Amino acid sequence: MSSNFKTPLSVYVLYDKDNTKGSETYEKIYHLLCRNSSRPFEDGLDIPVFFRTDMANQITPIDINFSNKTIAILLVDDNMYCNTIWDEYIKELLVKQDNGALKIFAVKLSKYAFDINPLLQEEQFICLKNENIETDWHEFQIRLYDNILRYLKSYKVGQKLKLFISHSKKDKDHLGESTAISLRDYLRSDTKLDSFFDVNDILDGHQFAQQIQSGIASSLLVIIESDTYSEREWCRIEAISGKKNNVPSILVNVLNGVSSRTFPYLGNMPKIRFNGKWDDVIILLLRTALDQYYEKEYLEQLVMKCDLQNTSILPVPPELMNLINIEDNIKSILYPEPPLGREELEVLNKNGKITSFVTPSQLYSNMNKIQDKKIAISISETPEALTKGIGKAMFDDLSVEIARHLLVTGAKLVYGGDLRIGGFTKLLCDLSCQYGIKEKSDPSTIYFTNYFAWPIFNRLSKSDIAEFKYDRVEIVKTEIPKGVGEEDKGKFFEPTTPSKMFLWANSLSIMRKEMEENVNARIVLGGKIVNFKGRMAGIFEEAICAIQKKHPIYLLGGFGGASAQKVKLRQKNYLKKQKPMRIIKI
């Protein structure tokens, strides 16, 4: 793939360092727009989300060349308003906005927010009822999704999203019709919602098909599934019209009795049981639209950059309905993560036309031949990551995504970790467990091997060992270093004295050498360069062990830390006599 690949969109969350909720808000927005590492096989929006804050009296500039479009979300509280360092920074952002390089969305978290810069127009502000993102989380999501949708789709000022409500008028309790009217009235009673939704009543299926085709770029569909919805011809026509045109659609379930038959083409879309709160429905609808629009642009760019022949893209998981109008030359379908399960693929593969259904991760795995190879991951957070706008949410997500992609290729994971709460060992164990369950593999199948050095492995309880076994994780306890007395071999202690520090350092070195004996390649990113417990920074030592064994090393230097230092050494040719390393700067 071309090295200048750009994502369709990236988002930067800007907050003052004294904003006590700033980091937490960034992580919530990251999980909202990108992914949550604790749920690696759920469908995230996959939009890159970074942050910027005033560290050491300076703010790192936003990289407008990272993506085709860039959004800056300003969290304007009293701290940002009072801190003069933001004055010049916001001026620079406004210049970039005037040049079309990015779009600013400011969140009003202070009564003085409108005065932070006279050129920052009031209509650019997301104004919340209580001026508190945590309290007004539902409202914030709606405003944020709407603003991002408009910018991504290049809507004109005042242009509305066309919302179609498909419902049955023949329920005995009139629940389908009354629910549709309730949604329409709710949207029209809220001036902000009415400003961006053009709510349409569908008179009949034929008219809907014409309407949807004439405004497909800005159309959304809400299906109210009541008792008689599947029985009504026009309802079925409306549902099929939405599917054929890939209109972002959701299903709102209001069943109040027995439905004699469920229309088969009401599946493969988000579904919600109506609980009387329309905000939940609107959030799901806008998220679904943003997901499809972003994935469509991303996959189209991927097909072009990778020069994929005879490939068509779908912004949703494929189903047989999607294959009806596929051109004869198309042999492969590229669709968003996560991959479909085997049972669905078995049905799709009987279509007799399309020979391959792949996600981006599977696309890459097909290009690599690392089945059953043991790939070691060297990763830890670095203080430098903060100045680069990379928080814990992204670091955790990165480690899980690398591991997930490796598992998809058929590789096995190897890591030298400990038992810290929130550490990478726990993350990788959870991933191994979820992947095994998803693949329906034999419980004895091992996906991840974790090496424990002495005396760390003395902290392993039977409960820990049982959990590792359940998670399909192999535990390797490495050799105890020389000089440890018999009475200490079964004990755990912290490296609090020079003699204990010496034993810890020796033990970690033994663990790293033994681990390297049993791997095929290593991926390196982050890494402490101070306050480490070994003879040197752990990632440095692991890289040296890999070089000595002539194993390939893949350095991701864009996250700072020891891996970045290693990249600099390589670039200065200090290691030119060693086996070449692959350097990846992200």
Residue ranges and their predicted role:
Residues M1-R35, Q58, Y81, K108-Y186, ...:
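C-terminal interaction surface of TIR/SEFIR-family domains
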Residues H31-R35, T60, I64, T70-I71, ...:
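Acidic/glycine-enriched connector segments
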Residues K28-I64, Y81-I85, S182-Q213, T228-E233, ...:
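Conserved BB-loop
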